[in-house]
């Protein structure tokens, strides 16, 4: 079922890790831990397990960027299978809220990314129709989704030779929220010209569906290129999915409206008895407007707040989520579990406190509280085998796995963990300056991690006065600004970057051979064992990698990190010796900046200049068009990481202007 495409075979610790994990899965163990260093091939190990077991798979990642990287890698490993991407479809999202202290109501504001929305629908469709499906998702996986049984009822199939009146076919499409548009065929619409009906699926822009009629009979079905209308493939039959994941039929709408009105009566009675007339009026107006829209159009603004009734759930019953679309035997991989598990645990409480105010003050019915993410205990109730993956797994994962950890320490590339040196804080700035001169002589880059914003700024000014090519990354920087600074570091525009929390999971800077950690002995979230190990691991892409701890004494976290580092180095050195491997720095392409624009026309220019002439605004429009073109090209080439990066730039341009 799954066919793994790769030019290499498992090596290093990979064969043993694959075997250990496979044996535990076969023994029906539900919790497994894979502890792997950076560069040990954890994604390739996941791919081998997927291919071995031929089970539908969910891979969870704690942010969109890393999820997109995993998606791209798995898509390369499994080009003949369905690899899907399920994350939040909002480019911008501000949830509905009410602040009683200032009597401020904040309406929901969002900007939907249609491409991500289509990919979410594609994920649901694939899970319900194909077993050879891999879905890469973020925390969005535990948020509400439509009841899979009800959603599947909205699928309908057509076949060549089927007797079907065109008007009945149109009605079937409209019931599933397709809109007729004979002028511009956009996703989720259809056009009818003579005996030919063309449908633009809501779940993909790769093709359109052409259905040709002869009288009241379907004569031909084909998928075509949506732009030039050339034939892609002929079909004997075709399964058509809804245009909206919250498709509702008349029976459901009638039931929902009845149940909502019953709850409304009870709630209005409650407000009246408690002399809350403003809340009473507010709620009645809101709910009646929603129900009028639902009865007329089958959908309304904020329909998710009535999810309990749409799904047919009882009060307090857990919501349907992406997890309910998985078959019972599915595999679940939790990447960077030390970050992902706490994220899963935190979602419910934050959502609940916000919505409780909306209910208490008459903006929503109490049933809106059931439009929520899963609680962590509900997530735990799913019996899929869960494989936790991290360089630094937490106590939760280890305890769940009965203390058994499958380790991957050896890198097939032969690269070692960087050497760690501990130095006194005395004269540390002068010492760092000397190190920077050595780095420049080798044409290698440096990162410095501080603990305060003030010290970062002072250190940056000091090195600038010394003539160093240095940049400072801080929390005020937008996504594109951080990425651009790091790109310029790799390119050599900067030799040094200073910051507080630079080395987050997933950062990849092969040109950096020196990482300096100031105040390494200050036990804190950024200086505990897990954080230090993560930092050291991120500096392991260069064959001459080195980490310097500046400290007055060796803290417990420092000692544990140094011991961990020494053990990993010895294992890798022995492996390299046995296999004749000479470690070499990873060669990785440096992404180009936005093409065709000098600084005057760059993104920084448009964001930093508040007063803009008409000429400058025209240049801004030209830049936006160029960005959109590059984003589309990156998406078509399945370079989703770059596409998402370009999308973020567009959003930030829009916010500033």
From Swiss-Prot:
Give the matching InterPro entries. Answer: Helicase/UvrB_N, Helicase_ATP-bd, Helicase_C-like, P-loop_NTPase, UVR_dom, UVR_dom_sf, UvrB, UvrB_inter
A Gene Ontology annotation in the biological process aspect, one of them, is:
SOS response
Tagged with keyword Protein biosynthesis? no
**Top-rank lineage group of the source organism:** Bacteria
Give the motif span (Beta-hairpin): 89-112
Q: Which residues form the Helicase ATP-binding domain?
A: 23-412
A GO term for molecular function: ATP binding
Positions bound to ATP = 36-43
Print the keywords alphabetically: ATP-binding, Cytoplasm, DNA damage, DNA excision, DNA repair, Excision nuclease, Nucleotide-binding, SOS response
Query: What positions does the domain Helicase C-terminal occupy?
Result: 428-581
Chief subcellular location equals cytoplasm
> Which positions fall inside the UVR domain?
621-656
Write out the GO cellular component annotations: cytoplasm; excinuclease repair complex
Subcellular location as annotated: Cytoplasm
What the entry says about domains is: The beta-hairpin motif is involved in DNA binding.
What job does this protein perform? The UvrABC repair system catalyzes the recognition and processing of DNA lesions. A damage recognition complex composed of 2 UvrA and 2 UvrB subunits scans DNA for abnormalities. Upon binding of the UvrA(2)B(2) complex to a putative damaged site, the DNA wraps around one UvrB monomer. DNA wrap is dependent on ATP binding by UvrB and probably causes local melting of the DNA helix, facilitating insertion of UvrB beta-hairpin between the DNA strands. Then UvrB probes one DNA strand for the presence of a lesion.
Family under the similarity heading: Belongs to the UvrB family.
How does it associate, per the subunit comment? Answer: Forms a heterotetramer with UvrA during the search for lesions. Interacts with UvrC in an incision complex.
**Name listed for the protein in its UniProt record:** UvrABC system protein B
State the organism named in the record: Mycoplasmopsis pulmonis (strain UAB CTIP) (Mycoplasma pulmonis)
């Amino acid at each position: 079922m799954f066919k793994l495409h790769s030019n290499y075979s498992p090596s290093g610790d990979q064969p043993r890790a694959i075997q250990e994990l496979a044996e535990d899965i076969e023994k029906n163990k539900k919790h497994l831990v894979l502890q792997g260093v950076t560069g040990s091939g954890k994604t390739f190990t996941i791919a081998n397990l997927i291919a071995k077991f031929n089970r539908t798979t969910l891979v969870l990642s704690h942010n969109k960027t890393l999820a997109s990287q995993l998606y791209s890698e798995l898509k390369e490993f499994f080009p003949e299978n369905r690899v899907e991407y399920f994350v939040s479809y909002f480019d911008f999202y501000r949830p509905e809220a009410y602040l009683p202290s200032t009597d401020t109501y904040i309406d929901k504001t969002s900007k939907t990314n249609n491409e991500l929305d289509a990919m979410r629908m594609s994920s649901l469709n694939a899970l319900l129709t194909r077993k050879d499906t891999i879905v890469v998702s973020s925390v969005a996986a535990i948020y509400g989704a439509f009841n899979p049984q009800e959603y599947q009822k909205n699928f309908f199939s057509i076949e060549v030779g089927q007797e079907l009146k065109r008007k009945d076919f149109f009605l079937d499409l409209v019931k599933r929220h397709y809109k007729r548009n004979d002028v511009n065929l956009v996703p989720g619409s259809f056009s009818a010209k003579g005996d030919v009906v063309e449908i633009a699926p809501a779940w993909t822009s790769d093709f359109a569906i052409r259905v040709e009629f002869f009288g009241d009979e379907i004569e031909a079905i084909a998928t075509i290129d949506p732009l030039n209308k050339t034939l892609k493939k002929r079909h004997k039959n075709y399964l058509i999915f809804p245009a909206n994941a919250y498709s509702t039929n008349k029976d459901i709408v009638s039931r929902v409206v009845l149940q909502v009105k019953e709850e409304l009566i009870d709630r209005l009675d409650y407000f009246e008895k408690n002399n809350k007339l403003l809340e009473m009026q507010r709620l009645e107006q809101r709910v009646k407007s929603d129900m009028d829209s639902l009865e007329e159009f089958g959908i309304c603004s904020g329909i998710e707040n009535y999810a309990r009734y749409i799904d047919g759930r009882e009060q307090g019953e857990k919501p349907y989520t992406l997890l309910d679309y998985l078959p019972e035997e599915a595999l679940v991989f939790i990447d960077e579990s030390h970050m992902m598990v706490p994220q899963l645990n935190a979602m419910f409480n934050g959502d609940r406190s916000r919505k409780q105010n909306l209910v208490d003050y008459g903006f929503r019915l109490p049933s809106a509280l059931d439009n929520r993410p899963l609680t962590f205990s509900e997530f735990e109730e799913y019996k899929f085998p869960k494989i936790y993956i991290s360089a630094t797994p937490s106590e939760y994962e280890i305890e769940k796995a009965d203390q058994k950890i499958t380790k991957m320490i050896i890198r097939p590339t032969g690269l070692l963990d960087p050497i760690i040196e501990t130095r006194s804080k005395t004269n540390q700035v002068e010492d760092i300056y000397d190190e920077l001169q050595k780095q420049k002589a080798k044409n290698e880059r440096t990162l410095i991690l501080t603990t305060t914003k003030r010290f970062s700024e002072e250190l940056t000014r000091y090195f600038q006065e010394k003539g160093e090519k240095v940049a400072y990354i801080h929390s005020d920087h937008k996504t594109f600004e951080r990425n651009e600074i790091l790109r310029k570091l790799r390119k050599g525009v900067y030799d040094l970057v200073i910051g507080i929390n630079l080395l987050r999971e997933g950062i990849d800077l092969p040109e950096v051979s020196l990482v300096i950690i100031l105040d390494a002995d200050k036990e804190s979230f950024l200086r505990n064992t897990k954080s230090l190990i993560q930092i050291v691991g991120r500096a392991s892409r260069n064959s001459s990698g080195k980490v310097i701890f500046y400290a007055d004494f060796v803290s417990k976290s420092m000692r544990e990190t140094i011991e961990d580092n020494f053990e990993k180095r010895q294992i890798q050195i022995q492996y390299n010796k046995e296999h004749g491997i000479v470690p070499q720095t990873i060669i990785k392409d440096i992404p180009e900046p936005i093409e065709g624009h000098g600084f005057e026309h760059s993104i920084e220019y448009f964001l930093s200049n508040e007063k803009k002439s008409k000429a400058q605004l025209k240049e801004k429009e030209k830049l936006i068009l160029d960005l959109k073109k590059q984003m589309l090209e990156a998406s078509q080439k399945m370079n989703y990481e770059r596409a998402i990066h370009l999308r973020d730039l567009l959003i930030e341009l829009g916010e500033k202007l």
